[in-house]
């Protein structure tokens, strides 16, 4: 499932000079990563000078480095004041060490930002994360949090930076788009469908007794239909169906008790419920009594 919005960019596969330095040609993202980025942006303070939030992307690379699989991420505090950028590196290192102690095998593969596209400061942050992913190039994800419901993707784009010219300065680089796709297991499809489904209209709550009455009426109607079917089969007016007969046999086989036994079971269940309620109230009384006795013993012990 592709996450890129419609774009006229051409993805070129240039011949690399070294296989370890070759930029990736495909980025796969787990759905939880996008959810974490959106959650991070929703908690962003409106009074902050930074209009976006950034964080580190954790994942793995393929053997040839052509595919980057992003499995998790975490927020990295930073500040932007014009061309001045400050990233909390100690916090980032503490998070990496903490995740490593908990058995996480993912490594930093790049960073994300909650903005529509890249800007001049993105090159500086890209250079910072390139030192973390060395010798591999760092990938960059931009998430458009203000995208409208146009049905053209989720506004997630992938980028890698390439040097431009002979100088090695961060300003002399260009961001090249990389295709991004979402990757999930079959067991996670149900949760994704539930999250992306339209919000259902809430139905007014019905009182308990009318709801029970409607349920019993529907059950009685179904029983009448089954009875009419059985009578028509016995009379020979309708051809019997083996599947329906099997379902009726399985349903009736669960209720082998007679009317007296059913009534006795209901009474026994009611008696058990009353017994449990009585014992719970008795225990509650004992606990309250023990607490009051302990309060009375404290002044005597002090004297």
UniProtKB/Swiss-Prot annotation:
Keyword Nuclease: no
Highest taxon above the source species: Eukaryota
GO cellular component: eukaryotic 43S preinitiation complex; eukaryotic 48S preinitiation complex; eukaryotic translation initiation factor 3 complex, eIF3e; eukaryotic translation initiation factor 3 complex, eIF3m
One of the GO BP terms on file: formation of cytoplasmic translation initiation complex
Quaternary organization: Component of the eukaryotic translation initiation factor 3 (eIF-3) complex.
Pfam family, one: JAB
Residue ranges, compositional bias (Polar residues): 1-10
Residue numbers spanned by region Disordered: 1-25
InterPro entries listed in its UniProt record: eIF3f, EIF3F/CSN6-like_C, JAMM/MPN+_dom, MPN
Keyword Cytoplasm appears in the UniProt entry: yes
Record's protein name: Eukaryotic translation initiation factor 3 subunit F
Function text: Component of the eukaryotic translation initiation factor 3 (eIF-3) complex, which is involved in protein synthesis of a specialized repertoire of mRNAs and, together with other initiation factors, stimulates binding of mRNA and methionyl-tRNAi to the 40S ribosome. The eIF-3 complex specifically targets and initiates translation of a subset of mRNAs involved in cell proliferation.
Record domain MPN: where: 27-165
